[in-house]
Amino acid sequence: MVSYGSHSSEVSKVLKTPKFVLRYGNVSSKQRFALKRKINYKLRESKYQEYLNEYNTFVLYDWENSGAGSLVDSSYNLPSLWKEFITEGISKGAINDKLPTVFMKRKLTNSALGHCLGLDFLTDPSESEHEYRCMFQTVQDIPSLSQLILFNSMPNVPVRLKLHTIGININFGCKRSLISNGGDQDTEMSEAVSYIQPLLEESSRMYRNLNYWKLLKIARNNKKDEPLDQSTRIKSQVKLLLSQLATNRITSPSVTDHGGHNWLIFTRRRL
């Protein structure tokens, strides 16, 4: 069940009509533009908040050159490449379109999502123009997360999308949280998430300055009070997930507690 998210255009339509000018008096074009921009920003922030309440996972992708072109080249239609990326992911089974999913048509409004989750890398003014593409999904198990992590654009395209951030909802209050009371799959996810977070936190020295090799070490570490049981399917899946994150350089973990939303977030470390 897939939808393509966008904020409501009703307010935008109103702002374009003469009634707006009549209602608010003699305002300049600059003032009208500023107000329109502010309202659109609030609409997007509200929409992101709605999706964070509704879905238990979000994924951010950003663009990288593959040696054949530049992102700033105006000949590339990035919305079309984003749509092709989604189609390719679904056709290859990396994106399960049978799960509740929403793909944001437009590029991410970075600071809006950053304010929703308290993510500094999105609210930093220097990052305001960095282009991310975003999808929200309600995943049901660790293998679904692994599929999302492993899927990137094919290398033969001029500019391609690459995984940058993955967020997992661990908020007990969220109706679609990975920790809920919705059956066997929810129980599996609850066990998986409840294992990932302490595993990172117990490795506190690594947690503060994580990198590729340290995350792999955490994933492989068996010297715990409760050893990682290789025969336990879910724990084995968690080990594989952490290894996949490390392979993709997604080695900056954090836990947000902002506005009632608790998310375990992994972000690609800057080189």
From Swiss-Prot:
Disulfide bonds: none
Role this protein plays: Involved in 5'-end processing of mitochondrial COB, 15S rRNA, and RPM1 transcript. May also have a role in 3'-end processing of the COB pre-mRNA.
Keywords: Mitochondrion, mRNA processing, Ribosome biogenesis, rRNA processing
GO CC annotation, single: mitochondrion
GO biological process: cytochrome complex assembly; mRNA processing; mRNA stabilization; rRNA processing
Main location class: mitochondrion
Keyword set includes Signal: no
Annotated protein name in UniProt: Cytochrome b termination protein 1
Compartment(s) where it occurs, according to its Swiss-Prot or TrEMBL record: Mitochondrion
